[in-house]
């Protein structure tokens, strides 16, 4: 978007500043250590579409030929930019559930490719050539070699090769190494005097290429970084028009990488042991003192620039490796106390300067800038004094006026007359009082661009001024709050770290009542990492006797995840839960990979042209840039469209016809008058409210050519470049319009005089002066870019590469943010019927009953139903006694005490298994802990072999031809050429008619 400056003018956005260094990774959080799941099958390498062609570089000049003047020396090479700092580690996913399956073999980590060198210095701009037609599409570049692999891990057994799966997700880019030491900037040599230009000689043959300089030793490989989260696909950019290939700049040196950290000890897999209590958390150790930086390495000699090699074809994708065998399950270790943090080591000495990397491909063409505002016209200066009049000629005899004749042909240009003396310059008038500001007039038409003047002498580079005060604008009102964002996706499962040493086993206390959930405290400092070894598993005890059935205990801890049961019948869909409150913002994620370029969006509507603003103050001249190497010859441009015809002026009133006077002598040219005083600037307008961000409009018309900038300093003398290829011949120019007729009316024909004597041949005429170069016409509009051609067919798949070796497991990442509570699951199907239990032991033998009727006891209270006892043996039947008389009914007695509980009966048969209970709600995930300390970087493995180059795809169809480009601006007027040789004398003309008699 465009802003408004203090004077109400539209400010064009400046170029984007350089990216700041990336911060160091934060420490990992103290979250629980998750177990690693089985590794996914490796995806096939994707073959993404080739990005759009970069913007054209500026056309270079032809090298000096023959005995030409000395070329300027090339500018000094700037110091290499610092290497970016290591990126933040990506956030790890939620810890996985502890399973009974063993750890699977890890795939070897792919080494990071070395960082690309800094972009070379831009080439010096060549002469403005006309834009050429679009060239054929170049061959795809050679596929880069893969980076060094990680250290060789224990290789699992090769499994059977599975079917080719879909391509896997793109892995995150590893963090760049630590920045290398910046080399000292060499002192600039003295500026040599510019030699006089000699005559243009015959173009010489290109000399043999110089010997290549010794390449500096390569820097240490960068450490493998933490995997970062994949970034979202960027918005589709506007495809730039294809341009000419720019000159390849020198590559910067590669900075040294940090030393690899030590590899942690791996625990021996053992049998599952009992889970011990968690040890106490250790106090963090003191921070070590940072050591002094090491000395800077020597700068290698720069070798001669070699000829570019042919572009290779992309190699075939590698074959997908088979899955590794699963390892033995490891025992659940007990988390031990964390040791103190180690001291920070002093940085090592800077490595030797690496060999320069290849230059990166040019970026996409940026959007054309907005058309500049038309400046206010300057006030006309006062007229100069008129020179003294020349001597009046003698009046001729006026002839009879003849009829107006037809327009004659343009006569031969006569010899130029002598230049008159310059008139005296007039005195500058006094500056008048500034008048009131006038009303804003309508926007004037764009004036024609003037011819470019000759470059002035190089001025000294000015010092940078102090930063000006802040403008009088006020801060905009805050916008409305946006809608809440979507919940983040759960992160990927982290890699398991090394097992800690077992802590001391404490006595198990009684389980208390569950208390209320307290407020979460601030996260404590991250403790050091334990380094103990795995303990031996304990012996399995003998099964104990079965005890009596106890009372139901409190709800136990969540058990380990059991094996997956049979799929239950689908239940009814549950009601969707309420949306929870928005959680606290998580830590800043690592920068993602650059997304693929999307299709070009439709062109937006043409924006309205803004009102012309006040003329701004001229800014100070910027510092002179370094002189770049000469670029390649540009191709001739296409013919531009004819410009619009100018508007016809108003016809003036016809004046009276005056008598035809004799032509007077040529007067002296008056001196130009002084420049008028500059008007005072109007008051600044009020700052408006910030407008809404508009859509990107179509490219506006090209602006007028700006004034030439100050010339840069004379560069160092460079070597003679190779001879460029001869460009195609340009189109012939159009025939210019006929010149205006000469002054004066056509005279009446005179009478024929007598033939005179043949005259002698006249003296040889002098060569005419060089005519003034005419003003350039208005620049035509730029044509629309042609449609892109179809993409070529993909290359055939090459042979598979060798499978990589397994790398060491990386450190565990912090747990992810808490996700929303899940919906209740569907009711599962009833489980299978259980097996019948074992028969219980026989109960004790019952007492033998007494014979005879007992006395009627008081009715006791019903006791608790005891278990069914064993059937007693029948006693001997007693003799029947005489029946007594019936007594009176007594009152109801008091309730007797409960009788003793009978012996425990035999265990009954196992009943049918009950229905499976409804699945409970899923608990809330824990909050994310603070990031833990960065893990030690893994060792970089050897570089894999590059695959063979695939066949070249068929060429794409040619795109539709674009409109004719614009005519380039006229170059500066060159120095006067050598004086031509004297022409040969022409043949003697025929004798003239005789003259009049004397």
From Swiss-Prot:
It comes from the Eukaryota. Pfam families: Collagen (PF01391). One of its GO terms (cellular component) is extracellular region. Residues 9-22, 112-128, 146-164, 212-251, 371-397, 406-425, 484-493, 597-611, 624-651, 680-696, 725-734, 746-758, 889-903, 937-970 have a biased composition (Low complexity). The modification 4-hydroxyproline is found at residues 25, 28, 30, 39, 42, 45, 59, 74, 80, 89, 95, 122, 125, 131, 140, 146, 167, 176, 179, 206, 209, 221, 227, 236, 242, 245, 260, 269, 272, 284, 293, 308, 314, 323, 329, 347, 356, 362, 368, 377, 380, 389, 398, 404, 416, 425, 434, 437, 455, 472, 478, 484, 490, 496, 502, 514, 523, 537, 543, 552, 570, 585, 591, 612, 618, 621, 630, 636, 654, 663, 672, 684, 690, 699, 708, 711, 732, 741, 749, 758, 776, 785, 788, 794, 809, 815, 821, 830, 836, 856, 859, 862, 934, 937, 955, 970, 976, 991, 994, 997. Glycans are attached at residues 98, 919. The modification Phosphoserine is found at residues 104, 600. Expressed in bones. Residues 318-327 have a biased composition (Gly residues). Residues 62-76, 904-918 have a biased composition (Basic and acidic residues). The modification 3-hydroxyproline is found at residues 698, 975, 990, 993, 996. The modification 5-hydroxylysine is found at residues 98, 263, 338, 564, 675, 845, 907, 919. Residues 166-178, 653-665, 808-818, 853-868, 988-998 have a biased composition (Pro residues). Its main location: secreted. It is found in: Secreted; Secreted, Extracellular space; Secreted, Extracellular space, Extracellular matrix. Keywords: Extinct organism protein, Extracellular matrix, Glycoprotein, Hydroxylation, Phosphoprotein, Secreted. Residues 1-998 are annotated as: Disordered. Contains mostly 4-hydroxyproline. Proline residues at the third position of the tripeptide repeating unit (G-X-Y) are hydroxylated in some or all of the chains. Contains 3-hydroxyproline at a few sites. This modification occurs on the first proline residue in the sequence motif Gly-Pro-Hyp, where Hyp is 4-hydroxyproline. These protein fragments were extracted from ancient femur bone collected at Rampart Cave in Arizona. Type I collagen is a member of group I collagen (fibrillar forming collagen). Trimers of one alpha 2(I) and two alpha 1(I) chains. Belongs to the fibrillar collagen family. This is Collagen alpha-1(I) chain. The lineage of its organism: Eukaryota, Metazoa, Chordata, Craniata, Vertebrata.
